[in-house]
């Protein structure tokens, strides 16, 4: 993973080097699109189209943006924004905010073998506004192979135990 990755920056100079603390995640940089499906005991199963973007500004984190819309009619479904950090070798942290009033800090393991990146994360902190649904447990699994990103999300919410909620397969569209 010794590749240098650059990104346009809003700061003078315009292009910045990837911070060495997150160089192990360089292969994630860019835009990914694909399809996923969701289910939960309290809702009808659904399918969605997704776009995920990983970027950087030369600091020790990646920026993360996620947007989904319904396959059936294109209406917006969900969004997340946040940051990915590598505090130590083999460790990863995600700091995420949802427009539904939920924030989460997930921590876990990071494994890089050849061109494959794997992350196993569990929420250590979940914050909620007074009007947000009762989400009390979250965990995620990510696997990135060259130009292919898959993930699953497990959730415990509204009186239900932690269980499968989402799965998606995305393909790189822009580095």
Task: Report residues per predicted region.
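Amphipathic/hydrophobic helical signal segments and adjacent flexible N-terminal regions
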Residues: 2-61, 69-76, 137, 145-146, ...
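Short hydrophobic/aromatic-rich beta-strand segments that constitute the beta-sheet cores
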Residues: 34, 62-66, 92-96, 118-123, ...
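A structural detector for short beta-strand units
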Residues: 50, 80-82, 104-106, 138-140, ...
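A short, structured loop/turn motif at beta-sheet edges
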Residues: 53-60, 85-90, 109-118, 142-148, ...
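Polar/charged side chains located within well-ordered beta-strands of beta-rich proteins
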Residues: 64-66, 80, 140, 151, ...
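Short, solvent-exposed aromatic-acidic interface loops
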Residues: 67-72, 97-103, 126-128, 154-159
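Helix-adjacent hinge/juxtasegments
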Residues: 71-111
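Acidic, glycine-rich flexible loop segments
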Residues: 101-102, 120-139
């Amino acid at each position: 993973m010794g590749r240098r990755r650059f990104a346009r920056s809003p700061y003078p100079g315009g292009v910045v080097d990837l911070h060495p603390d997150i160089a192990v995640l360089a292969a994630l940089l860019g835009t990914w699109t694909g399809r996923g499906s969701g289910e939960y005991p309290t809702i009808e199963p659904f399918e969605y189209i997704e776009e995920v973007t990983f970027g950087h500004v030369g600091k020790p984190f990646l920026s993360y943006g996620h947007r989904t819309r319904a396959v059936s009619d294109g209406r917006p479904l969900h969004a997340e924004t946040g940051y990915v950090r590598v505090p130590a070798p083999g460790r990863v942290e995600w700091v995420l905010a949802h427009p539904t009033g939920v924030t989460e800090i997930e921590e876990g393991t990071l494994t890089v073998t050849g061109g494959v990146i794997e992350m196993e994360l569990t929420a250590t902190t979940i914050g909620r506004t007074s009007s947000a649904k009762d989400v009390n447990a979250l965990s995620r699994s990510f696997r990135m192979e060259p130009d292919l990103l898959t993930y699953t999300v497990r959730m415990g919410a509204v009186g239900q135990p932690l269980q499968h909620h989402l799965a998606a397969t995305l393909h790189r569209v822009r580095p």
